[in-house]
Amino acid sequence: MDKRILVRLAIYPIAYVLWGGLMWYSQIITPLDVTNLLLKLPLCNKEFYIFLQSLPNIVIEFFKIIYLYGFSSMIIGGIAYYLFIKRDFLKSDIILIDLALGWLFAGLIYTFVVVKSPFQVGVAKDLINMHYFWIFTKPTYEIPSLHTAYSFLLALHFKDEKPLNYIYFALAILIPISTLIMGMHWIVDVITGVLYGYIIYKFPKTIHIKISKALDFLAGHIKPCILCGKCKERETHEK
C-alpha cells in the first residue's frame, strides 16, 4: 500500500480523537445562555416541533437513519473516496482539515455563547437518545449546526464529482431537516450552519497545503528541500 495512505490512516484517527476532545475547552468558562432570545423567533416554538414530530412513523424513522448514519457516511465516505479511489491525497487532507477548523472556530462560539436544544427546553422530544453522543458533543452546541455546516461543506467539495454530487447535495438537504425532526436543532441553527459551511469551504487553503506536504514528507514522498519551495527541484517534482 502507498505509504502516503498509511501515514494518513495513522494520522486521521488521531486527528479525530483530538477533534472530539476539543469539546472540553468549552468548559473553561461559563457561557452566556441566549436560549430565551431565540424562543422569540419564528418557527422556534412548540407548535412547529409538534407538527414535525407528528409526521408518519415511517418518515420519522427515515430521518432518524439520515441523522445517525447519513452524516457519518458523508464524512467517512468523502475522505475515503479521495484517499482510496481518487488517490487525491491533497483533497482528502483539505476535507479533514476543513472539518477540524470548522470545529475549532465553532468551539470558540460554543465557549462563550450557548443555546439549549429544542428537546432540552421542552419544545421538542429527543427522538434519538442524545445522551449516547455526549462524549463528542453536547446539546448546547447549537449555533451554528455542525451537522448542517459539514453536510453542506462536503456537498461543496463534491460538486464536480458526478454522479456522487447528487447524493451529497441530497444529503446536505436531508440532514438539516433530520436535525429539526429529531428535536436536536432550531431553524436558526440550520440557517447559520449553511452560512458557516460556506465560509469554511472558502477559507484560504494555505495551512491545508502545508499540512498535506508535511504528511507526504512523513511518507517519504518528497524531500526536505521541497518543503521550502525555493529550489527548482520542487518544480520538476510537481510536474
Swiss-Prot record:
This is Uncharacterized protein MJ0662. It holds the Pfam family PAP2_3. The chain crosses the membrane at residues 9-29, 65-85, 94-114, 167-187. The keyword Chloroplast does not apply. One of its GO terms (cellular component) is plasma membrane. It is found in: Cell membrane. It comes from the Archaea. Coiled coil: none annotated. It is a multi-pass membrane protein. Keywords: Cell membrane, Membrane, Transmembrane, Transmembrane helix. SMART domains: acidPPc.
